Amino acid sequence: MAEFEDQLVFNSISARALKAYFTAKINEMVDELVTRKCPQKKKSQAKKPEVRIPVDLVKSSFVKKFGLCNYGGILISLINSLVENNFFTKNGKLDDTGKKELVLTDVEKRILNTIDKSSPLYIDISDVKVLAARLKRSATQFNFNGHTYHLENDKIEDLINQLVKDESIQLDEKSSIKDSMYVIPDELIDVLKTRLFRSPQVKDNIISRTRLYDYFTRVTKRDESSIYVILKDPRIASILSLETVKMGAFMYTKHSMLTNAISSRVDRYSKKFQESFYEDIAEFVKENERVNVSRVVECLTVPNITISSNTE
């Protein structure tokens, strides 16, 4: 009986010790979760249908090479896939055919001829989307209701006035209080989406003149996506541990490498740049310019002078 009582006491002590142990562990876990500030999950959004690029707006030699002439429209994902699978080596580097047939700037060609293919600066599959996007060109005009409208960045006011004159869009006098509001039909929205790759922002087929002006400004703006960028100062390469190549008086690095290096300096939970990074770039980026990664990239680089080759 005494032995049984001793066993009960032993079990009782073990239970209390075990309870205290687990309680302490649970408290530690809760504290860690509270201080960690777990990032919120993004709300899942319905996937938008992919826009088809009209065949006449895709580089003609590319269309012929892959037999796309009879397509009603070419998905950009198909262009991406064809570029990735036909113009790169097994090691993921741009091959000689790609250098000849894809759209490269003169600077890009000079850099590729200067560096070794094994260099991290060499164009690789991470640049597929940029190269694929260059195979499509912006429309210079669109047709609607028997009228042809020309797209010129410095003549957008004339374009809107012509749309009104032709009654392709109509002034909504009731809604026009602070700004002129126009009724834009679904048929015209479809034409713009197909030819210009994006739709204007409308609500119940109503759009303001300001929004319409901004829309045409964006779609007529030249795409200046770059694979290589010029650093404002050689010290930037040291701060961010970037590979570089010097061409004349300019020091180049890959845009993707610079973006990734800056992104790695963003705190995962606070979404702000690390304080040490602020100190390192203070000379090049003003405090009010540290808005996001894209803005910092702009501040650390010199605008490229783009001269394209292989365009049609």
Curated annotation (Swiss-Prot):
It is found in: Virion. GO terms for cellular component: virion component. InterPro entries: Poxvirus_I1. GO terms for molecular function: DNA binding. Pfam families: Pox_I1. The keyword tRNA processing does not apply. Coiled coil: none annotated. Induction: Expressed in the late phase of the viral replicative cycle. Keywords: DNA-binding, Virion. Its main location: virion. It comes from the Viruses. Each virion contains approximately 670 molecules of OPG077. Belongs to the orthopoxvirus OPG077 family. DNA-binding protein which binds to the hairpin form of the viral telomeric sequence. Required for the production of mature virions (MV). This is Telomere-binding protein OPG077. It comes from Monkeypox virus (strain Zaire-96-I-16).
